[in-house]
Amino acid sequence: MAVVSALAELIGTCIITSTPRLARSAPAIVVSVYLRLAPEHRLPAAIDDGFSALMWLRALARGDHDSYEPWLSNYGDFNRVFLIGDSSGANLVHHVAARAGQVDLSPVRLAGGIPVHPGFVRSERSKSEMEQPESPFLTLDMVDRFLKLALPKGCSKDHPFTCPMGPAAPPLDSLNLPPFLLCVAETDLIRDTEMEYYDAMKKADKDVELLINPGVGHSFYLNKIAVDMDPNTAAQTTDLLEGIVEFIKKH
């Protein structure tokens, strides 16, 4: 059974609508990672925590950890570990995977990364930021305020944490990354910079697939009322989960 490490602070609606369905369908053991939060703990604290969780899985796989997790030790396939995160957690997928590519994970194999609606942005507003409608899950004010609280003090949105395809970041072709599935919502405010990341990954000859959900916005699947009441939101949530499951099964 694949092991999926969820790099996000999962709120109730996400747990209800997404995580159990993913675990059942993959099938997979989903490990929810506890992350220190900003502004008390600015980045790279959450990246450090995500990487520490991966090292904990490696220790379990090697049998050299003091604690014992029956589900993981007895049923987890450490040869198929995936990183998944949504929104800001999707940024962590990229950075934790990049850091993991610099160390020996054996017997763990990082089989893939799944950034869902990543918070990749630039200081200059993109066309989609200026033209797409805001949603309850993401407004321009939220983008600005959240990143001001999360980034290292004095840093702009061009920082590698939020712009891994920018000139300040390590060249993507220099990174040892597993296969990626980038999930994008068509009406997401930050769709254009997410697509810029996809294009940069392809240009760097990285193994990256793209899944676009039409007619929905940032983190649409977290709205349980919409998932239950709106046919398109429900259908797109199913399509998103099925795409993620297909990617996991393929790798």
Regions found by a protein language model. Give the residues of each.
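Alpha/beta-hydrolase superfamily serine-hydrolase fold, recognizing
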Residues: 1-251
